[in-house]
Amino acid sequence: MQQQHLFRLNILCLSLMTALPVYAENVQAEQAQEKQLDTIQVKAKKQKTRRDNEVTGLGKLVKSSDTLSKEQVLNIRDLTRYDPGIAVVEQGRGASSGYSIRGMDKNRVSLTVDGVSQIQSYTAQAALGGTRTAGSSGAINEIEYENVKAVEISKGSNSSEYGNGALAGSVAFQTKTAADIIGEGKQWGIQSKTAYSGKDHALTQSLALAGRSGGAEALLIYTKRRGREIHAHKDAGKGVQSFNRLVLDEDKKEGGSQYRYFIVEEECHNGYAACKNKLKEDASVKDERKTVSTQDYTGSNRLLANPLEYGSQSWLFRPGWHLDNRHYVGAVLERTQQTFDTRDMTVPAYFTSEDYVPGSLKGLGKYSGDNKAERLFVQGEGSTLQGIGYGTGVFYDERHTKNRYGVEYVYHNADKDTWADYARLSYDRQGIDLDNRLQQTHCSHDGSDKNCRPDGNKPYSFYKSDRMIYEESRNLFQAVFKKAFDTAKIRHNLSINLGYDRFKSQLSHSDYYLQNAVQAYDLITPKKPPFPNGSKDNPYRVSIGKTTVNTSPICRFGNNTYTDCTPRNIGGNGYYAAVQDNVRLGRWADVGAGIRYDYRSTHSEDKSVSTGTHRNLSWNAGVVLKPFTWMDLTYRASTGFRLPSFAEMYGWRAGESLKTLDLKPEKSFNREAGIVFKGDFGNLEASYFNNAYRDLIAFGYETRTQNGQTSASGDPGYRNAQNARIAGINILGKIDWHGVWGGLPDGLYSTLAYNRIKVKDADIRADRTFVTSYLFDAVQPSRYVLGLGYDHPDGIWGINTMFTYSKAKSVDELLGSQALLNGNANAKKAASRRTRPWYVTDVSGYYNIKKHLTLRAGVYNLLNYRYVTWENVRQTAGGAVNQHKNVGVYNRYAAPGRNYTFSLEMKF
């Protein structure tokens, strides 16, 4: 049978078919109507572009501060809302752990501010038998977006640009200067912003002041934020929830053991014999069914997200002096503090009959006076006794503090008549610490009081503290030189980057102890018969005394386990040198190539830390062919690397003294080819990429073969063990409909973004065992983002509608295998759930009130659609920083329903 092939029109084809002929017609019309016009001098601030560093711009996104305002970016999750292929890594307790790009995440994606690397995600192993998967925070400090002038997001290996960590990509922030606040022709500038986000009840207030007098200038930005957890769709938390709570059995029926009677010595003032008629029976317990709102429910079946209180304060101060029109010296002082206070309400607040073991604990059920519940308890952590009258609360308090100060010298030669067009010398001293504290209370009725503590009036109350502080400090010297020049009618744009870094990493374990209020108790036994046996005729004789609070330190030193509170110190230094030359070969082609050499040396007083010296050479090469004025053909190849993190260097400790391991850098190779259509109609880019990763570091053993049998060799630990490869498609475009057809309004536009990743390969080195193949839970499901908007030509007002569609998370990306001995393997799965397809529609707009005021508003999830993103559900995956375990229901991961954002900006 003959098949009939039909050509299907879609938005992409329609755009190209209509745009290209019109563009060609416009070019001819322009050539026919050329006129000699007066010279107009226009001054404009240079904007960062996708091709500033690398000629092709493949895989890159650049957002200016104006773009961030227009997209109403108020936090890290808003930054990549409409950018498929890059996602935020949820830390599991309100914070974040960087970004995921092309199947990799956390420390495998470089994060810098003004060229200075931010803190690593340091995940320390948790205590054995606990509910936590990480003892430390595992977060990466977040950036204050009101301080940001521009952000460059690079997808694909690019260590030749950003060095260590740019294995799969990078996110580079550039902070504002006084010139970004002071308007053209003015000597001062003031900007104020007040914003509210309904999805997390977040309020942002920011004020920027800048001034210039003579050659002196200064910038000061202060930003304060506060908010709560992101609220799930209202339907996800509807109704009530029920649970069992262990309570005193006030309505105890007759029966039970005949040996349940006792008298209290302190209540028998006339002797034992006289008190036999004041018998007491052992108190007993029962499970009582309770029904509460979904907000108050605690347990694995909780429907709502854990409550969170978030706060942030940031200062950025940049004074400087223009010595003349070419030379500038300045300084920068930055301080940002962020707090994330969370209560883990997936931990049940109350005991049940499953926790209660009658008759096994001394004095169980005995009591003084009428306080029948005072000695009803269960045995908890560290053999502590915890009363049933209190509720348990588990709280995580995180404090992220960043301090940076530095100086810089900038040389800018607009005439370009010396050896350098631009040079910058800088020194930055940066310190970041993440203070993470676990507090477990059992001293208030329902467990909600974080500040309660055991005391003499609360028998069998309990408290636990566990604190980890991770700190990184850096002293970074940077030098940048740029020069544009011509040789044989070929235009060169040469840049040289040099840097030297001294760094230190420290993990401190402290405030690790238990407190338990214990009541004095004794069973009094007479010297001669009859001996009490608990019967009515011969009741037990007990003494119940005062309650004292016992504090038990858990910290140990030098035992190489989680309880080891010896500080983990790793220091070192490194340097790099990079050269990039982007060459324009007339109008037909651009080529670029770059190379970078990195050196790092580390040391530690702990001889079990895998320190050493690493040398790495990275490169990139790109070409842009321009066969037509309306089309570019692009190709890019680049490499990336990641050095072992400080946590991996410290290793996995299980009590024994470990040998150091020879950890090599992880490596990646990126190839990407694209086609770009451009003209009056806008631009459209489609590209195909292929990324290979090798020597990925994972936990496992080496193998050895003897007499035909393979066995595990050496200590367990982190080793170069995994290889992986992905491929995919990326589409990015913006259509100017007025450029397509002049009859349409000037300012009407459409945007298009699409990203798809397919796993090609994942394997384990043959000389490794008990290693799981790389699981691609970090891959974002395929996503389309379509936009239709209008901006008034004079910038008075604008409106934009964004439609996002995500495919389901592929089960193939979650499946893997664990290599065992002698060729055997176990199937592994990253997560027990995956997400279904979803879509969401957002509408946002702005209106400029007169000249100085801009009102912005947005309605997100306009149709109030209930959906769940993979980024949220991924918190239950094995690779999560703080994995959510024993999840009963997944409602808590639902995205917000219809929500609103408002902001008012003032610029003077």
Swiss-Prot record:
<comment type="subunit">
    <text>Binds both human apo- and holo-transferrin (TF), via the TF C-terminus. Forms a large complex with TF and TbpB.</text>
</comment>
<comment type="function">
    <text>Neisseria acquires iron by extracting it from serum transferrin (TF) in its human host. Acts as a TF receptor and is required for TF utilization. Binds both apo- and holo-TF, via the TF C-terminus.</text>
</comment>
<keyword id="KW-0998">Cell outer membrane</keyword>
<dbReference type="InterPro" id="IPR012910">
    <property type="entry name" value="Plug_dom"/>
</dbReference>
<feature type="signal peptide">
    <location>
        <begin position="1"/>
        <end position="24"/>
    </location>
</feature>
<dbReference type="InterPro" id="IPR010948">
    <property type="entry name" value="TonB_lacto/transferrin_rcpt"/>
</dbReference>
<keyword id="KW-0813">Transport</keyword>
<keyword id="KW-1134">Transmembrane beta strand</keyword>
<dbReference type="GO" id="GO:0015091">
    <property type="term" value="F:ferric iron transmembrane transporter activity"/>
</dbReference>
<dbReference type="GO" id="GO:0015344">
    <property type="term" value="F:siderophore uptake transmembrane transporter activity"/>
</dbReference>
<dbReference type="InterPro" id="IPR036942">
    <property type="entry name" value="TonB_rcpt_b-brl_sf"/>
</dbReference>
<dbReference type="InterPro" id="IPR039426">
    <property type="entry name" value="TonB-dep_rcpt-like"/>
</dbReference>
<keyword id="KW-0675">Receptor</keyword>
<dbReference type="InterPro" id="IPR000531">
    <property type="entry name" value="TonB-dep_rcpt_b-brl"/>
</dbReference>
<feature type="short sequence motif" description="TonB C-terminal box">
    <location>
        <begin position="891"/>
        <end position="908"/>
    </location>
</feature>
<keyword id="KW-0732">Signal</keyword>
<feature type="domain" description="TBDR beta-barrel">
    <location>
        <begin position="187"/>
        <end position="908"/>
    </location>
</feature>
<feature type="domain" description="TBDR plug">
    <location>
        <begin position="51"/>
        <end position="176"/>
    </location>
</feature>
<dbReference type="InterPro" id="IPR010916">
    <property type="entry name" value="TonB_box_CS"/>
</dbReference>
<dbReference type="InterPro" id="IPR010917">
    <property type="entry name" value="TonB_rcpt_CS"/>
</dbReference>
<feature type="short sequence motif" description="TonB box">
    <location>
        <begin position="38"/>
        <end position="45"/>
    </location>
</feature>
<dbReference type="Pfam" id="PF07715">
    <property type="entry name" value="Plug"/>
</dbReference>
<dbReference type="InterPro" id="IPR010949">
    <property type="entry name" value="TonB_Hb/transfer/lactofer_rcpt"/>
</dbReference>
<dbReference type="InterPro" id="IPR037066">
    <property type="entry name" value="Plug_dom_sf"/>
</dbReference>
<keyword id="KW-0812">Transmembrane</keyword>
<dbReference type="Pfam" id="PF00593">
    <property type="entry name" value="TonB_dep_Rec_b-barrel"/>
</dbReference>
<keyword id="KW-0843">Virulence</keyword>
<keyword id="KW-0798">TonB box</keyword>
<protein>
    <recommendedName>
        <fullName>Transferrin-binding protein A</fullName>
    </recommendedName>
</protein>
<keyword id="KW-0472">Membrane</keyword>
<dbReference type="GO" id="GO:0009279">
    <property type="term" value="C:cell outer membrane"/>
</dbReference>
<comment type="similarity">
    <text>Belongs to the TonB-dependent receptor family.</text>
</comment>
